[in-house]
Amino acid sequence: MRGAMLNPIVIAAGGTGGHMVPAESVADELMRRGQRIVLMTDARSAGQKSAVFAGCERHVLAGAGLAGRSLGRRLLGVAQLARGTVAARHILAKLDAAAVVGFGGYPSVPPVLAAATLRRRPAIVLHDQNAVLGGANRFLARFADHLALSFEGTVGLPGRARATVTGNPVRAAISVLAASPYEPPAETIRLLVLGGSLGARIFATLVPEALARLPEGLRRRIALTMQCPGEAIGAARGALDAAGITHELAPFFSDVAPRMAAAHLLVARSGGSTVAEVATIGRPAIFIPLAINTDQRHNADVLARRGGAFRLDQATTTPDRLAGVLESLLDDPLRLAAMAEAAASARIEEAAARLADLVLSAIAERVR
C-alpha cells in the first residue's frame, strides 16, 4: 500500500541549522516508526555531517534564494529553481514518494513544486520554524495538504491554509533536558551568550562593554560563556579581563544543551530554533534579534509577551542599555526564576512526534 515502508517520505530541507534541526528531528522520529526517509537538499547542506541522514538516500538539487537580490541574480535563481524542480520531479516519480515534507527556505521549493505536478501526487506537508510564515512557505502553501506551525498566532498565514500548531522540533540533546529545574543564582551567576552558528560579531563588543558597566560586586560573581567569532576573541578577552569577568570564549560550543540548562540567564539571537530551545529547557533570556530579520522580532515576542524574555532591538541597544537590563535581572534571583517558569510555559511537548503524526495522517488522507 502506498505510504508503507516501500514508499519513502521525502524530507526537503537545507541551508541553515534553523531548517535542518527540525528536519533531522522529524526524520529520526519517522524512521523509528519504520518509515523510509529520502533527503532532498541543497549544495550548502550536502556536505554537512548528520547522524540522522547518514544512512539515507539523498539528492542534491539546484536552487537559489531570490529575496534581496538584483534582477539579474533573481533571473538566475529562477532558472536554478526550475532546473531543480525538473530534477526533483523525475526523482519523486521514480521513488513513488508517499509524502514530501518541506521545512522552508529555497531548498524546499523544487521538491514541493515537483510533488504538486505529479499525477500520483504525494502528500505535501510544510513546517515553518518562525512566528512569521517564511517567503518560501507562503508561496508553497497553496500546494500543501497541511501547514505545521511552531507558534500559536503565526503571522502571514494564507486564508485557506490547513494549519496545525505542532511546535518546533528541537535536537535530542535539548529534548532530554525539557523542564530541567531552574536554580536561581546564589553566589556565582552563569551567563550564556549565543550568537548563531559562528557567533555574532556585535555581541563580541556589546556584551563585554555592557558587563564592564556593572557594579564591581556583581561583575565578580559572573561566569560568562560566550560564543564569539574567532577573529574577535582577542579583543573580547582583553575587555573582559580588564572588567574582572570570569569567562570562556569560543566560536562554537558542541555542548550547548547542558550549558543552556546550567545558565541562569541567556543573551541570544532569536531564531526559531533558539526560541524553541529556550522554551523547552525553560530559561530566562534577553533576545537581541538580527536587525534585518523581522521573523526574529516576532519569535522573541512569543516569550517576551509571557514574561519569559526581554526583547532589545539591536539598533537601540547600547552598552548602557544592556547593562541596565542585566543589572536589574542579575540582582533579582526571584525575578529570574519567574522568567524561567514563564519561558517554560511556551514549551510545546513532543513537537517531533506531533509533526510525524501530521505527516502520517496526510499520507492516510491521500491513500483513502
Swiss-Prot record:
Which GO CC terms are listed, alphabetically? plasma membrane
Tell me where on the tree of life, at the top rank, the source sits. Answer: Bacteria
Q: Which GO terms describe its biological process?
A: carbohydrate metabolic process; cell division; cell wall organization; lipid glycosylation; peptidoglycan biosynthetic process; regulation of cell shape
| Presence of keyword Transferase | yes
Q: Where would you find this protein in the cell?
A: Cell inner membrane
The UniProt record gives the binding positions of UDP-N-acetyl-alpha-D-glucosamine as T16, G17, G18, N130, R171, S197, Q296
Pathway it acts in?
Cell wall biogenesis; peptidoglycan biosynthesis
Which terms are listed as keywords in the entry? Cell cycle, Cell division, Cell inner membrane, Cell membrane, Cell shape, Cell wall biogenesis/degradation, Glycosyltransferase, Membrane, Peptidoglycan synthesis, Transferase
Q: Does the keyword Methyltransferase apply?
A: no
Q: What is its EC number?
A: 2.4.1.227
| Stated role | Cell wall formation. Catalyzes the transfer of a GlcNAc subunit on undecaprenyl-pyrophosphoryl-MurNAc-pentapeptide (lipid intermediate I) to form undecaprenyl-pyrophosphoryl-MurNAc-(pentapeptide)GlcNAc (lipid intermediate II).
Q: What is this protein called?
A: UDP-N-acetylglucosamine--N-acetylmuramyl-(pentapeptide) pyrophosphoryl-undecaprenol N-acetylglucosamine transferase
